[in-house]
Swiss-Prot record:
The keyword Iron-sulfur does not apply. It holds the Pfam family Lectin_leg-like. It is found in: Nucleus membrane. Keywords: Membrane, Nucleus, Signal, Transmembrane, Transmembrane helix. Coiled coil: none annotated. This is Protein UIP5. One of its GO terms (cellular component) is Golgi membrane. The chain crosses the membrane at residues 399-420. One of its GO terms (biological process) is endoplasmic reticulum to Golgi vesicle-mediated transport. Residues 421-443 are cytoplasmic. It comes from the Eukaryota. It is a single-pass type I membrane protein.
């Protein structure tokens, strides 16, 4: 009887395992049925992503500065370039001045999936309690306000018409025009609204796709801006003691292919690791120049009555491309899945866009200048417990087949051990039965 019970349990275990594996197979076939862009992402077949990092030297800045500046960058305001030291955008005790650098588009500024790392330093007289005003990091489709002769009122009006209203001689956006289109990250070092100066420095992330009607409001520290502020829950706080008079890095990661934006900071005082400040996977499109398809990279700083020294030390730009493939593939679902795999392997971020979500994103990109309204593309930061839970669940799902394989191997080995024992018992019984039957025949 015990042999029958054991055999029944074994049969049930094998049946359950078989049904589960069949269910997994049918589910995959069903979910991917009709998907012409399906890319196999099984843990058994996926290795390193085909997407790799490619340095973009045209959109980068490093010592010595002058050669690169003369070739690929515009300089504005009171910027001072020290060839083997730094680019001083503003100088302490130099009131009501601004400085900026912005890529000129002569080099390669057609960037879609990319990482930009700005290295900078903000310093001031240690005896001074208050400093200002701050700095800005921009990715914009517009750089004509630095190149055109806008001395006459007619030239200014003509430029405003051609640029959808950009106010060329305004510097409210920490040195940039207040209605500059594109993505801009404001690092504010002085609180204009209210008297609580303990909150500085802080950061805000804005996007402007309608410069004729939207702008950044410096007097309210961005609070009354009509440009869309992505961090709608309040200012993003920065560490004052780690920022002042120290080398700091700000990293922008943007993958247009899967609509992913992430902003990190690295304080030299605290170590060689990144701290996430902002992240969103909402359908967020950074506008490109309508004529060239380029995005220009810039950095600026502004002094008011209060002053500080802002130095730009390095700009490092890398693009992400599929190895040895035409750029047209970067608009396909195949590439999107490879980009997700690259994002997971390179930055530890897990995304899983479905085909219908990808199709919706392509439709949004086809109409990039439609305003997203007041609804925020709110960040899904690492501080959000739901985001962490989602990543854990998604990671477990990605590797569920490996877990099933391990379970299958275990059950298979258990089956082998059971059969070996049964076989030994059967052999021993046969031997005993054979030994009892041997003897003399009756007379």
């Amino acid at each position: 009887m015990s042999r029958d019970v054991r055999a029944e349990k074994l049969a049930i275990s094998l049946l359950i395992l078989s049904l589960f594996l069949i269910f997994q197979l049918v589910a995959e076939i069903y979910l991917n049925n009709g998907d012409q862009y399906h890319t196999e992402t099984s843990p058994f077949t996926r290795g390193r992503s085909h997407v790799t990092r490619v340095p973009n030297h045209d959109a980068s800045l490093s010592i010595p500065f002058l050669d690169k500046i003369n070739q690929f960058w515009h300089v504005g305001g009171a910027t001072q370039i020290r060839n083997i030291q730094s680019i001083k955008l503003t100088q302490d005790r130099d009131q009501d001045k601004h400085g900026l650098v912005l890529s000129n588009g002569i080099g390669d500024n057609t960037i879609n999936d990319f990482e930009i790392v700005f290295t900078f330093r903000i310093s001031h007289d240690p005896t001074t309690q208050l400093t200002g005003d701050g700095m800005c990091f921009a990715i914009t489709p517009e750089n004509g306000f630095l190149t055109q002769n806008l001395q006459s009122s007619y030239a200014k009006k003509q430029y405003m018409m051609n640029s959808q209203g950009v106010i060329a001689d305004n510097t409210d956006l920490m040195g940039f025009p207040k209605n500059l289109p594109g993505l801009f990250i404001v690092l504010d070092t002085y609180r204009n609204q209210g008297h609580d100066h303990k909150e500085v420095p802080f950061m805000d992330v804005f996007i402007n796709v309608a410069p004729e009607s939207d702008w950044y409001d410096i007097n309210s520290d961005g609070e009354l801006s009509t440009s869309l502020r992505l961090n709608s829950r309040g200012h993003i706080k920065l560490k004052k003691n780690a920022l002042w008079n120290r080398v700091t890095k700000l990293r922008i990661i943007y993958l247009e292919s899967i609509s992913f934006l992430k902003i990190d900071v690295q304080y030299a005082k605290e170590g060689n690791y990144w701290i996430e400040l902002f992240q969103t996977t909402e359908n967020l499109y950074l506008p490109k120049n309508m004529h060239t398809g380029q995005r220009y990279i810039g950095c600026s700083a502004l002094n008011g009555q209060l002053t500080e020294t802002v130095e730009l030390l390095d700009v490092s730009t890398s693009e992400f491309h599929w190895n040895d493939m035409d750029a047209s593939i970067e608009d396909t679902y195949d590439y999107a899945k490879e980009a997700e795999l690259f994002l997971e392997q390179e930055f530890g971020e897990v995304l899983d866009r479905e085909p219908d979500e990808f199709t919706k994103w392509k439709m949004i990109k086809a109409q990039p200048n439609i305003k997203t309204g007041s609804q925020s593309a709110e960040q899904k930061t690492s501080n959000n417990p739901h985001s962490r839970l989602f990543k854990v669940v998604l990671t477990i799902w990605h590797y569920s087949e490996i877990l099933l394989l391990i379970m299958g191997i275990y059950l298979f080995s258990a089956c082998i051990r059971v059969f070996q024992r049964r076989f030994k018992k059967i052999r021993s019984r046969r031997k005993r039965a054979g030994s009892h039957s041997v003897g003399l025949l009756p007379m």
